[in-house]
């Protein structure tokens, strides 16, 4: 995997699972990492939520992130966060499996964009 480009989604998930992502690191990283740096919409939502948790003084780890996602109803829009974090952060997963996860993420984004276009067309009566 060393010849592949750095993937922020996998890094965030792996960091949450390993306990390497802490509140202090999030505060430090805010200057260089934006939600839009993540290609996956779920990661964007999770990163924004994590920033809010840090602002509220909540410790950051996989458990608190998953619980907070459930409390704030984030999962209603993103789907289950726990399985997503585990899938993305599984260090023993073969690289092909990780690529498949990312491909599935791209498909979800395309479907979501298509649904938005269809909805916009219905709103304007052009469909």
Regions found by a protein language model. Give the residues of each.
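Short amphipathic helix-turn segment from helical bundle oligomerization domains
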Residues: 84-88, 117-122
């Amino acid at each position: 995997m060393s010849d592949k480009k750095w993937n922020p989604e996998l890094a965030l998930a792996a960091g949450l699972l390993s306990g390497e992502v802490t509140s202090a690191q999030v505060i430090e990283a805010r200057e260089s990492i934006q939600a839009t740096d993540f290609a996956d919409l779920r990661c964007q939502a999770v990163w924004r939520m994590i920033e809010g948790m840090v602002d509220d003084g909540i410790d950051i780890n996989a458990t608190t992130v998953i619980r907070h996602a459930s409390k704030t109803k984030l999962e209603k829009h993103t789907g289950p966060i726990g399985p997503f974090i585990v899938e993305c952060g599984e260090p023993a997963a073969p690289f092909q499996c990780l690529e498949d996860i990312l491909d599935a993420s791209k498909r979800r984004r395309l479907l979501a964009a298509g649904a938005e276009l269809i909805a916009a067309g219905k709103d304007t009566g052009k469909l």
